[in-house]
């Protein structure tokens, strides 16, 4: 019941909050202008931008340049961090390959961590590099999505200014909400301090070092921005990051808020005036929510069912291996599904200890990479499936392939197919390399089916810009650092470039009349068709390897 109430409440909050996002996205005046405008203008002066409207090509160039600059600075700081200030625990520099992986990971909103949070970075890099990139990577995804929506919906005839979009989103959305969430987490016991690690003497007389630091400030944007990188190695399974059931709900709600709101925002932009949400967006929301609930049901059923091998020995009950008692199997499964559906990557339990079908659920969500997804890019990926579904359905019934009065032609379909294929190609090719390259497979700590699942999960998490992992994998090696870094880089930027090309191409040949021979996108049967094509296309792509991994493991447990 608590899960049903929580999900219902989050849908309602996201619907209401999308109205505020609508004013932020379209640069409309609001009551908060007096608070934020001066700070925004100061940021624009520092950046040196004149807020001129950009073409799609210029917008992409500035997006890539901005991200490239941040990536270089991050890499340099990580390889010299031990010689900088705010390092009371005397943490060492990262190796070249690990710094490469870490910089790309946080730059692309993945937050895949091949280092221990306690010892891998200093307080300085944790706050200036990691926390800063959590804001900018999230805002970058939002900015390119809003640019795409402005053109697709025809609400404006401009794509916007990249720096204006990113600054407004950080100042008016991320910063206020992060401050509020940080305060709420501190009331639940999450630390926020610059003191060095605590050194205590245990009851047995041994010395123990307890790691803590400025955790609350990172924890808020970590979930709000669908980032996922933990201050501590145990991530949100540790009491300092996630002390109790209330902090658990706060963190889950933070992950869901903005991606859900983006879908409703799309609906408001389609309705032109923003006071209501267009039926097309509601159909998309219901379709994604249906897949979300289906995967959640599978995961919870599998975790509550427990391990059949133990059941045969007379040990009945839920699968509690790798889980925190304060959360139990139910809330652990919910957190797992949310963090992979919304591509956050934080964990409140160890995914490597999930049952075979319990691990299948989050893996499938990342393979789909379309069920709500991360900030902005999740909606962009969904629209690719919408265009693909429309094109196939239209040809099947002899109607004109058209979306929002814009004909879908051969040029757009080439880009759409490329976006669709990049994701599985990166996952499958690099997974195969992990078994072929000498030394790479030595990182696999489990034999047979589960070992394949470990590799597939790691590569899928990198390709989906998620960041969670089956942490039994020994991933801090040259192969895993470089390979996952390349995957994260390609899977982030190539689709974004192609998606903006698709939207610009559609708009340039926009038709201003409604053709009666087109598929209705605001009817329930379109939502059903979308679900069928998502499952069918992804199933044909990934079923063979899933049979070698979690499904094969499930069939062997008796």
Swiss-Prot record:
The chain crosses the membrane at residues 1-21, 66-86, 127-147, 166-186, 245-265, 281-301, 327-347, 354-374, 377-397, 416-436, 482-502, 531-551. Pfam families: KdpA (PF03814). GO terms for molecular function: P-type potassium transmembrane transporter activity; potassium ion binding. Keywords: Cell membrane, Ion transport, Membrane, Potassium, Potassium transport, Transmembrane, Transmembrane helix, Transport. The keyword Cell inner membrane does not apply. InterPro entries: KdpA. One of its GO terms (cellular component) is plasma membrane. It is a multi-pass membrane protein. The keyword Hydrolase does not apply. It is found in: Cell membrane. Disulfide bonds: none annotated. It comes from the Bacteria. Part of the high-affinity ATP-driven potassium transport (or Kdp) system, which catalyzes the hydrolysis of ATP coupled with the electrogenic transport of potassium into the cytoplasm. This subunit binds the extracellular potassium ions and delivers the ions to the membrane domain of KdpB through an intramembrane tunnel. Belongs to the KdpA family. NCBIfam families: kdpA. The system is composed of three essential subunits: KdpA, KdpB and KdpC. This is Potassium-transporting ATPase potassium-binding subunit 1.
């Amino acid at each position: 019941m608590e899960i049903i109430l929580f999900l219902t409440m989050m849908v309602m909050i996201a619907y209401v909050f999308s109205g505020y996002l609508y004013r932020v996205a379209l640069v409309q005046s609001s009551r908060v202008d007096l608070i934020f405008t001066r700070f925004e203008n100061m940021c624009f002066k520092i950046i040196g931008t004149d807020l001129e409207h950009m073409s799609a090509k210029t917008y992409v160039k500035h997006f890539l340049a901005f991200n490239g600059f941040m990536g270089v600075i991050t890499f340099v700081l990580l390889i010299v961090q031990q010689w900088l200030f705010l390092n009371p625990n005397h943490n060492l520099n990262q190796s070249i390959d690990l710094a490469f992986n870490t910089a790309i990971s946080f730059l692309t909103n993945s937050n895949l961590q091949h280092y221990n949070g306690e010892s891998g970075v200093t307080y300085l890099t944790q706050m200036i590099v990691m926390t800063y990139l959590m804001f900018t990577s999230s805002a970058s995804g939002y900015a390119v999505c809003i640019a795409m929506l402005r053109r697709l919906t025809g609400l404006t005839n401009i794509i916007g200014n990249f720096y204006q979009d990113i600054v407004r989103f950080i100042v008016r959305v991320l910063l206020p909400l992060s401050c509020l969430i940080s305060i709420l987490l501190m009331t639940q016991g999450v630390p926020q301090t610059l003191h060095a690690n605590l050194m205590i003497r245990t009851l047995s007389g041994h010395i123990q070092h307890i790691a803590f630091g400025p955790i609350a400030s990172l924890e808020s944007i970590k979930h709000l921005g669908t980032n996922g990188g933990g201050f501590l190695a145990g991530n949100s399974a540790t009491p300092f990051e996630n002390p109790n059931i209330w902090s658990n709900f706060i963190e889950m709600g933070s992950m869901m808020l903005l991606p859900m709101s983006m879908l409703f925002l799309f609906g408001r932009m389609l309705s032109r005036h923003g006071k209501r949400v267009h039926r097309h967006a509601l159909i998309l929301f219901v379709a994604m929510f249906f897949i979300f609930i289906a995967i959640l049901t599978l995961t919870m059923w599998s975790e509550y069912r427990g391990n059949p091998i133990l059941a045969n020995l007379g040990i009945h009950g839920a699968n509690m291996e790798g889980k925190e008692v304060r959360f139990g199997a139910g809330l652990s499964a919910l957190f797992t599904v949310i963090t992979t559906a919304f591509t956050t990557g934080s964990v409140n339990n160890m995914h490597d200890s999930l049952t075979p079908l319990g691990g299948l659920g989050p893996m499938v969500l990342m393979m789909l990479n379309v069920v709500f997804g991360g900030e902005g890019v999740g909606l962009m990926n969904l629209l690719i499936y919408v265009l693909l579904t429309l094109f196939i359905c239209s040809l099947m019934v002899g109607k004109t392939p058209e979306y929002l009065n814009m004909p879908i032609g051969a040029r757009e379909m080439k880009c759409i197919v490329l976006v669709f294929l990049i994701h599985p190609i990166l996952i499958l090719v690099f997974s195969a390399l992990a078994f072929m390259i000498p030394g790479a497979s030595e990182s696999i700590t489990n034999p047979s089916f589960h070992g394949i699942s470990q590799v597939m999960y790691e590569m899928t998490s990198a390709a989906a810009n998620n960041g969670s992992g089956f942490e039994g994998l020994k991933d801090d090696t040259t192969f895993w650092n470089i390979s996952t870094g390349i995957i994260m880089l390609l899977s982030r930027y190539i689709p974004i470039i192609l998606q903006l090309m698709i939207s610009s191409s559609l708009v340039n040949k926009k038709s201003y009349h409604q053709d009666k021979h087109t598929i209705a996108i605001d009817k329930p049967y379109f939502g059903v068709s979308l679900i069928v094509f998502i499952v069918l296309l992804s199933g044909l792509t990934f079923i063979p390897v899933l049979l070698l991994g979690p499904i094969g493991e499930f069939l062997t447990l008796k």
